A protein has these predicted regions:
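Metal-centered catalytic cores of metalloenzymes
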Residues: 2-5, 12, 17, 21-80, ...
Length: 143
């Protein structure tokens, strides 16, 4: 092989190696949290219920994983969901959480649009009961 061809081959190999090594560094696991209470609901209610949810979002696999718990609700939970929605606004269900019994645990693979909203703070989690069908406790999901 001529020196020029060898130099080109080595340059290409070095560039390919650098890209391959950098690729995993581009992936990120984002830690998220959502403290839940009745005053965060829209509209607020008088429940003494509280809860916490922690989550991680893996930007490479697009997987959202969560764990949470709650207590002191007015009755049994009838549903729990992640919703799209900014603080102070209600939004549609983005990801159901099932079962809704405490402790909560699960995972879901998100779409690009869902991930964008989640990481921008435009998601909340809430727990519903018979007494508060629209949601008894709510927490905005933040980093």
């Amino acid at each position: 092989m001529r020196p020029r061809s060898l130099r080109s081959a080595l340059t290409g190999l070095a560039a390919s190696t650098a890209i391959a090594l950098a690729w995993p560094a581009m992936a990120e696991v984002v830690n998220l949290k959502a403290p839940m209470n009745a005053t965060n609901q829209v509209p607020p209610n008088s429940s003494k219920g509280t809860g916490t949810l922690t989550a991680t979002y893996d930007t490479a696999s697009k997987k959202l994983s969560w764990k949470g718990s709650y207590s002191d609700l007015t009755g049994s939970a009838t549903a729990a969901h992640f919703h799209s929605g900014e603080p102070g606004k209600n939004g549609g269900v983005a990801v159901p959480i099932a079962p809704a019994t405490s402790p909560l645990e699960g995972s879901a693979t998100l779409t690009d649009a869902q991930a964008t909203d989640l990481l921008a703070g435009k998601w909340y989690v809430n727990v519903h009961t018979d007494a508060n069908k629209g949601g008894e406790i709510r927490g905005q999901v933040t980093k």
